[in-house]
Every structure is written in structure tokens, then in C-alpha cells.
């Protein structure tokens, strides 16, 4: 049978999602816990998105195959009892063999939280990005609006990105001032490697006056990663939702509704 899970994790504790020889990744820890519940059998998970080291998930979706018959609650409470405190399974659903956590998804959502304050916060360390002064949010919003739609996002793509095409449909890019933070909410059919962090980094340059909103259009048109500002820190980035067709009957389009930092 095939089981889908909704999970959340604090990325500070791990070297990213994808399995590594040293074993300190979210996937490694989850596979081991699931394997124990499955009767000490090997379990391999597949995720909607492969988050980098330091990146968090308020709602990641994974699936795995198993011939172990267990109540769904065992894949939640039982697995959570074996996971470190930085990872939690939120829900479990049995799905058909035609479901794939990555390839069945038609959209993904991310949020980036940025603290703009002269002094960094030790209490929010690793949970938010930080910049030492206030930013021109109006200019950032103007620049963000120019990125909406279907474009070649090569200028905001990591050099090691393995996506077949750099063309993505960015459907939402909102910048919200809330609880003393800036929150960037992004929604697209899919994202390139480092795309969110590269967009946030470029918008920060607009906010501090190093780039104009018109410059963002030039960066987009250049289709050249070397023409854009550096990749911004991973600390404030959260995978917050994955969209699937209704036929799979997964919870609320798998969106995280409880993400608040303050």
C-alpha cells in the first residue's frame, strides 16, 4: 500500500531533506522511524520538495510504499515517538499507487520571514532572516509585482539546479508587514533550486536602494544568475503548502494554517 504523510520540521537541526551518507537529514531520520513501525523493514520516502539545510517545513508532503498493515494512527503517533523533537508527522492518509508526492503536485507555497532591526534576535536565530535596517517596502512590492506570471527565472536559479526548465508560473508574491517582521508569501506551480531565496535577496537590494524596481525587470530579462544579487540566507524560509488534485482527498490542499513566529 502507499501512504501519504504531512510533516513539519525545524530545518536548523538537519543537513536538508535529502538523504546523505552521514544520515543527519530529515529523510534519513523519517525513513528510520517509519522502518521501525513497519517491523524493521526498509522504507524509502519521496517528498514534494527537497529543502536545503536550514530551511523549514510547516507542511511538507511525502509518500512511501509498505506491505506492513498498520492503523493510520501508527504512522502518526507511533512514528512521532521515534522521531527527534524537530520533526513531526501531522497526518497520514492511504492513497492509490497513482499518487506521487512530487509529481502529482500542481503547486507549492513558501513563506520567508525577515526581521529588519539594528540588532539581531537570539530568540529568533535560525527561524528568520535578518537585515540590520528598515527597508522601502513600497518599492519592494512594486518590484515583486513585475515578477508575477510565467517567466524564465534563470536569473534566480542556483547553478546546480536540476530542473528541466527554468520557466515557472509565479502566481503570488505578497510582502506583508506583521508582528515586527516582513513576510514574503510566494505561490507557484513549482520553484527552481534557491529561487525563493534569490528573489528575496534581490528584493532586499531594492528595499535598501541598491536596485530599483525597474532593475528587477532587467534581472529577469537577463536570464543570467551572475547578474543578480547573492543568494539570501536559508534561516527564514518555510515550505508552507503543496497543492494536489481533489481526487487524492488530502487535507485542505495540504496547507499549513498555524505558522506564526510571534
From Swiss-Prot:
Keyword annotations from UniProtKB, A to Z: Isomerase, tRNA processing
Spell out the Pfam families in the cross-references: PseudoU_synth_1
As for family, the record states: Belongs to the tRNA pseudouridine synthase TruA family.
Q: Name one GO biological process term.
A: tRNA pseudouridine synthesis
As for what it does, the entry says: Formation of pseudouridine at positions 38, 39 and 40 in the anticodon stem and loop of transfer RNAs.
Q: Gene3D superfamilies, alphabetically?
A: Pseudouridine synthase I, catalytic domain, C-terminal subdomain (3.30.70.660), Pseudouridine synthase I, catalytic domain, N-terminal subdomain (3.30.70.580)
Query: EC number(s) for this protein?
Result: 5.4.99.12
The record's section on SUPFAM superfamilies has: Pseudouridine synthase (SSF55120)
Q: How does it assemble?
A: Homodimer.
Q: Which CDD domains match?
A: PseudoU_synth_EcTruA
| Binding residues annotated for substrate, in chain numbering | 110
Report the source organism: Chromobacterium violaceum (strain ATCC 12472 / DSM 30191 / JCM 1249 / CCUG 213 / NBRC 12614 / NCIMB 9131 / NCTC 9757 / MK)
Q: Which domain of life is it from?
A: Bacteria
Which PANTHER family does UniProt cross-reference here? PSEUDOURIDYLATE SYNTHASE, TRNA PSEUDOURIDINE SYNTHASE-LIKE 1
**InterPro entries reported for this sequence:** PsdUridine_synth_cat_dom_sf (IPR020103), PsdUridine_synth_TruA (IPR001406), PsdUridine_synth_TruA_a/b_dom (IPR020097), PsdUridine_synth_TruA_C (IPR020095), TruA/RsuA/RluB/E/F_N (IPR020094)
Q: Where is the active site?
A: 52
Q: What is this protein called?
A: tRNA pseudouridine synthase A
Ranges annotated as spanning the membrane: none
Q: State the organism's lineage.
A: Bacteria, Pseudomonadati, Pseudomonadota, Betaproteobacteria, Neisseriales
Please list the reactions this protein catalyses. Answer: uridine(38/39/40) in tRNA = pseudouridine(38/39/40) in tRNA
| GO molecular function terms attached to this record | RNA binding; tRNA pseudouridine(38-40) synthase activity
Which NCBIfam families does its entry note? hisT_truA
* Keyword Isomerase included in the entry's annotation: yes
Amino acid at each position: 500500500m502507499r501512504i501519504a504523510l504531512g510533516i513539519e520540521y525545524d530545518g536548523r537541526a538537519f543537513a536538508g531533506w535529502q538523504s546523505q551518507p552521514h544520515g543527519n537529514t530529515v529523510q534519513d531520520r523519517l525513513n528510520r522511524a517509519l522502518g521501525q513501525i513497519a517491523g524493521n523493514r526498509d522504507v524509502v520516502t519521496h517528498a514534494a520538495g527537497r529543502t536545503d539545510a536550514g530551511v523549514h517545513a510547516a507542511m511538507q508532503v511525502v509518500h512511501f510504499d509498505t506491505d506492513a498493515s498498520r492503523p493510520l494512527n501508527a504512522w502518526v503517533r507511533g512514528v512521532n515517538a521515534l522521531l527527534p523533537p524537530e520533526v513531526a508527522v501531522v497526518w497520514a492518509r492511504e492513497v492509490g499507487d497513482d499518487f506521487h508526492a512530487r509529481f502529482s503536485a500542481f503547486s507549492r507555497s513558501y513563506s520567508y520571514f525577515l526581521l529588519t532591526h539594528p540588532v539581531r534576535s537570539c530568540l529568533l536565530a535560525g527561524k528568520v532572516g535578518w537585515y540590520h535596517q528598515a527597508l522601502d517596502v513600497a518599492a519592494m512590492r512594486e518590484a515583486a509585482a513585475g515578477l508575477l506570471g510565467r517567466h524564465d527565472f534563470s536569473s534566480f536559479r542556483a547553478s546546480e539546479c536540476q530542473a528541466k526548465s527554468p520557466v515557472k508560473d509565479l502566481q503570488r508574491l505578497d510582502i506583508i508587514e506583521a508582528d515586527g517582521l516582513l513576510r514574503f508569501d510566494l505561490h507557484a506551480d513549482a520553484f527552481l533550486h534557491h529561487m525563493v531565496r534569490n528573489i528575496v535577496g534581490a528584493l532586499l537590494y531594492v528595499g535598501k536602494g541598491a536596485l530599483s524596481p525597474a532593475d528587477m525587470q532587467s534581472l529577469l530579462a537577463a536570464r543570467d544568475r551572475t547578474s543578480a544579487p547573492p543568494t539570501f540566507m536559508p534561516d527564514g524560509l518555510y515550505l508552507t503548502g503543496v497543492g494536489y488534485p481533489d481526487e487524492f482527498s488530502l487535507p485542505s490542499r495540504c496547507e499549513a494554517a498555524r505558522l506564526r513566529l510571534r
